[in-house]
Structures are given as structure tokens and as C-alpha cells.
Amino acid sequence: MSDLSGEDVTVVGGGIGGLSAACYLADAGADVSLLEKNEQLGGRASRLEVDGFRFDMGPSWYLMPDVFERFFAYFGKEPRDYYDLQRLDPHYRIFFKDGDQIDVTGDNDEMAQKFEEYEPGAGEAFEEYLSTSERHYETAMNKFVYQDRSELRDWVDLDVMTAAPVGLQLIGTMQSHVEDYFEHPKLQQIMQYTLVFLGGSPRTTPALYNMMSHVDFNLGVYYPDGGVGAVVDGLVELGEELGVTYETDAEVEEISRRKEGFLVETVHGDTTHPDEVVVNADYAHAERELLPDHERQYDDDYWDDKTYAPSAFLMYMGVEGDVEPLEHHTLVLPTDWDPHFDDIFDEPAWPDDPAYYLCVPSKTDDSVAPDGHSNLFVLVPIAPGLHDGDEIRQEYREKVLADIADNTGVDLRDRIVYEKQFAVSDFGERYNATEGTALGLAHTLRQTALLRPNNRSSAVDGLYFTGSFTTPGIGVPMCLISGEHTAEALIEDIA
């Protein structure tokens, strides 16, 4: 990247995208200061530490290790310089609510045999699907993800046109794409559930994201010792080595253009006057609440018409004893999950028969719980904007704990020694998340690639955005790349 010596840049928000952008900009020579609303850095990748338990409050899956390796390699580093990784086996366990159970492992020959047991011919279809997924992953990452193509003109390129057949082939939905390979509903669920973590439904997520199966089965699922919070610590440490300064408990309430540079003011009345600003706060919140009306790119109708990724009902729990047979990552899936997706995306309601996720990091890491105890959280995807008052939370808590006992055999109810709930209103309060989304903008057909909000402001020179609302999208790896894209855009404009 070009030399930014003498440029003063303020990054508003210390999520993964902001931490990433700060590193790239500081490496290019800019004086970078980062302001974070909350008491710790990491954004949704916050940590909760209490009574000897340590919880990752947000992301808990370490996927796409190649993205992290690429990020650190840019600075002459490796992930292991900052944290240690363990590859999980099994990757995760699935309990189906009809009593069936399957472990998803890193042995694809074994998985092909398991698929064959469910459906004749599915083993061969699984191998073909993964081969296709790998090709699409390599093409998508090299042509569409690592390269920022946020403008229509960026797609009129020989390399892109050469890769276009992949995009055309995958212009349908994940549901129709997976159904072309597998008829058994359980196999379809296995290949589609990770879409929830991209903020979408199989019925609306582009088939492009079949590449996530390559991520899942081929690249593997890892755990950073200490949790995803250790990755945040690594990004912050790298930033400090590059000269980034960080300030927490510094919520920004105004960003406005001045004749020379910007005014950035916090709720405490502290001001900075940078040359450029990178916003990692919730994009819609920043436009609606932090910028003057004449410096906004989009009106309220634009944001009101967007499809936001699910929120979540979370319970962080410290419990006595172990929680066998739960694995580090466990999914519990109903026989028919369409009603749950309807409750998220079509007719918002608390799901009556939910699909949900359990994370038990103490299965892998003794440091996250006191001796003789287990650390776990349960995550139920729910509609953004849903009312989540105390009464409905308590009622739903009882439903979920009973469901866990019925479908996994693990009854937690008499063993909980610590519990904290987190849901829609908490996402809104802690992260200024629009409609309490847990993730950002959903990856729908109308909100993918250049159809996502741009990382350059079209209304104000010198103002940029990074994170899960812009390209390339949702997830820790994508936000790392988003930080790179945003830094490149700023540098291109200054050079």
C-alpha cells in the first residue's frame, strides 16, 4: 500500500473490520487512532468474564484459516505469533429432534459413507458437491472477495468475465442448488445450516455460498486457545506494534465534515480533527445518528427496505459438572425447519420449534471455566426487531432448556451457577445494531457484492465504512477483508 505519512485517520468502532483497517492504514504510515463505544475492543467479538467463566459473546467459530494467514502474512507475521489454534474433531455434532444424531468430521471419506447411509448415491454426490464447492471457493475468493468490486465498472474486467460462469451458475438460491444434489432433508439441512451464520435463509441466500461447504468440510473448524477473544487480542497487539492508539469507553455521537478534515465528537465532549474517518459502527446507525442529514448517502426508506440478518436469543451459562454428550459445537435441528425460517424472515415471531446452536468451549479449553464446571452458551436465531421483554425471555428460557434436555439428554436446569441472557434489545443497546441484528445485512440475492452499501461515502470525501454491512459481508474473515478493502480505498483516494 502507498505511503500515508502525515495523514491523521480516526477509526470509529473497534470491531473486526475497524481493527483490520487500522492495521493496514498504520502500516501505510498514517497516524491512526481508534475510538470504541464499549469497555473493550472487538465489537460483537466481545468477552464476558465472571466468576471464573470466560465466554465469547459473539463469534465462536474459527473458519477460513487461510484468510487469517493471509492477513497476518501481509505484516510479515503468522497467526501463531499471537494465538494458538486447535483443529476440532468432530467439527460439530448434530442432534435431530427425531432422535437421530450425526457427527460432522474432517474425514470426508467417512462423511461420504454417512451420507450414503441416508440416501443411495449421496456419497458420490457429496464428493462431487465438495469438489464443485472448492472450485467455486477458489474462484470467488480470488476474483470477487479479495478484490474489492463494489462498483459496476469493477465487474467489466477480463478476469471477472472469465470467472462469470461461476456467478451465473450460482445465481439461484442455496435451497435449489442443494436440492440438485441431495433429496434427503437431513442431508440438505447439513449442507445449509451454516447459512444462518451468514444471516440468511436457504430460500434467499445465493447459491454462491455453496463455497461454505469447502470451508466446513475441507478447510476445517478450529478453536483459538482462549476463544475468539484471543484473535481480537492478536489484532490489537499487531495494531499497537504498528502504532495504532486505542481508546475505549469513547462513544462517538457526531461525525461531520469541516473545511479541513473532520470533526469527531464523543458523548463525553472529547473531539478529534482527523483528515479522514473510517466508520466501523453499524452503517445504518452511523448514517442516521452520527452524520448531518446533508452528509448521508441513503435516506430512511433505503435502510427500512433492507433485509437484516437474524438477531439471537443467547444464554451464557456456567454449569456444574460436564455436559456429555454435547460437543464443542453442537446443533439441534427440528425435522422441519421451514417454520423457524418463516418466524425469522416472513412473519416475525419467537420460534415454537427452534433450531439452535450450543457452544461448549470448556470441552477443548480448561481455562474458560473453573474446575468441575462447564462453560456453554446456547444461541437461537430469531427475527431482528422482535420484542424481547423480561416475560417472554423467561418463558423462552424454560422452553429452550426443556428442549435441550429432551433432544440431547443434557438437563442443565438444576446445575446452572451463572447465567446471563442477551437478545434483540441488548444488541441494539450495546452495539447500536439496527433492529438488534446480531450480524448486519443479510446475504440475500439483492444484498450481495456490489448491491451492498459502498465502503466509500458518495456524499462526503474522506469518509469510509468497513464491517459486515459493506463488502464482502458477514463473518470475522469477511470483516478482516473488509478492513483491507476500506484501507485500499482510502489510500487510492489519497495517493
UniProtKB/Swiss-Prot annotation:
One of the Pfam families matching this protein, by short name: Amino_oxidase
Keyword Oxidoreductase recorded: yes
Gene3D superfamilies the record matches: FAD/NAD(P)-binding domain
Pathway: Carotenoid biosynthesis
Single Gene Ontology BP annotation: carotenoid biosynthetic process
Disruption phenotype: Cells lacking this gene accumulate DH-IDR and DH-BABR.
UniProt keyword Transcription regulation, yes or no: no
Catalysed conversion reaction: dihydroisopentenyldehydrorhodopin + A = isopentenyldehydrorhodopin + AH2; dihydrobisanhydrobacterioruberin + A = bisanhydrobacterioruberin + AH2
UniProt entry keywords in alphabetical sequence: Carotenoid biosynthesis, Oxidoreductase
InterPro entries: Amino_oxidase, Carotenoid/retinoid_OxRdtase, FAD/NAD-bd_sf
Organism superkingdom: Archaea
GO molecular function: oxidoreductase activity, acting on the CH-CH group of donors
Entry's EC annotation: 1.3.99.37
Function according to Swiss-Prot or TrEMBL: Involved in the biosynthesis of the acyclic C50 carotenoid bacterioruberin (BR).
Family (UniProt): Belongs to the carotenoid/retinoid oxidoreductase family.
Xref: NCBIfam families: crtI_fam (TIGR02734)
Protein name, as recorded: Carotenoid 3,4-desaturase
Organism: Haloarcula japonica (strain ATCC 49778 / DSM 6131 / JCM 7785 / NBRC 101032 / NCIMB 13157 / TR-1)
